[in-house]
Amino acid sequence: MKIRIIGSVGSGKTTLAKKLSEWYQIDYFETDRIVWKREGIEVRRTDAEKIATLKEILQQENWIIEGVHLEAWATESIDQADVIIFLDLPKKQIRQQLRKRQIKQLLRIERAHYPVRFNMLKKMFYWDDLFDQRTKPLIEKRMMQNPEKWLVIKEKNEIQEIEKRMAQYI
């Protein structure tokens, strides 16, 4: 089973990837970790490094890849996926989840893979707006090419139903 999860920042991609990983006993990978080397300081990988890292993951029999990235280096993960889950949640839900995440990270209740700063919430709101303006139209266009591969989640409570809905792809 090859699963690709796409959605805006704060839509629940990582949470869902972890759940699916546990349910199906499949390793999950975050595209952010493909893009960024996080060894003390954050360094963006070159396109060649990203492609090589992704290629290594894609060679596995089963995988779950989550992330917002749709650039050329990441498209192979969409092409090879058996199912693509698009978390298309309402902006109000995403903003609420981002606020909760920021508070938990600042209080050190939840770990982050990036430096947690007070201005990060503002950046995430900006990235969410960019997703709606730039990425979402690209996703909608790709969905038309292979609609049978796509599973669109419009509300957070639908995520709880996903195991039932995933049965059709197994």
PLM feature spans:
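NTP-dependent small-molecule kinase module
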Residues: 23, 127-170
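Walker A (P-loop) ATP-phosphate-binding motif of ABC ATPase nucleotide-binding domains
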Residues: 2
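Glycine-rich phosphate-binding loop used to anchor ATP phosphates in small-molecule kinases
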Residues: 51-92
